[in-house]
């Protein structure tokens, strides 16, 4: 959190020392000095960043430092739910592209407002219909940006993911990725607007927006078949490991510095071959490993033990 401005876990309460009213983290490095202070007041947690004695409630993008997290749940993403895959892809792109991050936040706010309006449906109200159409236009604008950027990101980086996978697997393979847009991408905005119009009655009944990026998914193919159907457990985890190594490469390119790598009990999910390949890949980076197995300790590492 002190480096990137937010916790990977999402909840500030998870970052607090148990039963403590205040938690302070103090870091010093070639990036300067920074502290983050969390105060629990009447059940609400307040966050404050102190960077070289300058205080702020948020960490601006220019003060964020690149961090890449490897965690077990991401290695199981292929067999997980579409919503988990969407969150993974959105987070990956947003950490690299400030415009996408802003569009994603605006899209989620617009989706929430549109759903609230659907739930407050008023029969024969022209004002209500006009309001909904206005939200339709705004929703479609952000939805188009999100869907097209997701698809473009996967298309551009598919060859790199394939190469990384082959390096990890030690063999050539047929790997491809397809973004499952709910309407054609080439005229996404107009097609989505038409789709919403046709779904109006259904959406009024359910109170939810039935189409858009929040209902879309991407599929990974291995040997021209969905990986979820034909890939072994080890192959699935190798594919997701390739995604994370892609993030490591892209973060390095964007930030012009080597990211800090966090390995959260990941080695327990890998066999000996993939563990060795991962260690070789990250050996020139600074990394922090959490593990319950002493075999994963590397020479020259500082070790902090907890019981």
Located regions from the model:
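Conserved NTPase motor "head" modules and their coupling/switch loops across ABC/AAA+ ATPases, GTPases
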Residues: 127-260, 269, 273, 277-280, ...
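Walker B catalytic acidic pair
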Residues: 264-266
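DNA major-groove recognition helices of helix-turn-helix
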Residues: 1-2, 246
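A conserved P-loop NTPase coupling/switch region
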Residues: 58-64, 71-137, 141
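Residues that form or immediately flank small-molecule/cofactor binding pockets and catalytic motifs
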Residues: 20, 72, 180-182, 292
């Amino acid at each position: 959190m002190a480096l990137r401005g937010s916790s990977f876990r999402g909840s500030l309460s998870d970052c607090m020392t148990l039963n403590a009213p205040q938690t302070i983290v103090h870091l010093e490095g070639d990036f300067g000095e920074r502290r983050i202070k969390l105060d629990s007041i009447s059940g609400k947690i307040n966050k404050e960043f102190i960077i070289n004695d300058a205080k702020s409630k948020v960490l601006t993008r220019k003060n964020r430092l690149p961090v890449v997290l490897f965690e077990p749940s991401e290695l199981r993403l292929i067999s997980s739910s579409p919503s988990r895959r969407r969150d993974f892809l959105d987070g990956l792109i947003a950490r690299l592209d400030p415009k996408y991050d802003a569009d994603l936040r605006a899209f989620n706010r617009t989706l929430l407002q549109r759903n609230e309006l659907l739930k407050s449906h008023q029969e024969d109200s022209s004002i209500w219909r006009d309001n909904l159409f206005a939200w339709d236009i705004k929703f479609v604008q952000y939805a188009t940006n999100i869907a097209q950027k997701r698809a473009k990101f996967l298309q551009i980086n598919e060859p790199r993911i394939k190469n990384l996978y082959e390096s990890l697997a030690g063999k050539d393979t047929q790997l491809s990725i397809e973004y499952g847009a709910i309407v054609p991408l080439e005229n996404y905005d107009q097609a989505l607007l038409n789709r919403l119009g046709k779904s109006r009655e259904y959406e009024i009944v359910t109170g939810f927006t039935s189409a858009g990026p929040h209902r879309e998914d991407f599929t990974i193919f291995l040997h021209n078949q969905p990986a979820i159907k034909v890939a072994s457990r080890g192959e699935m985890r190798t594919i997701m490991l390739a995604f994370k190594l892609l993030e490591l490469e892209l973060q390095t390119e964007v930030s012009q510095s080597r990211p800090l790598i966090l390995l959260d009990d990941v080695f327990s999910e890998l066999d000996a071959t993939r563990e060795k390949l991962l260690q070789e890949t990250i050996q020139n980076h600074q990394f922090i490993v959490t593990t319950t197995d002493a075999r994963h300790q590397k020479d020259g590492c500082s070790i902090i033990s907890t019981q």
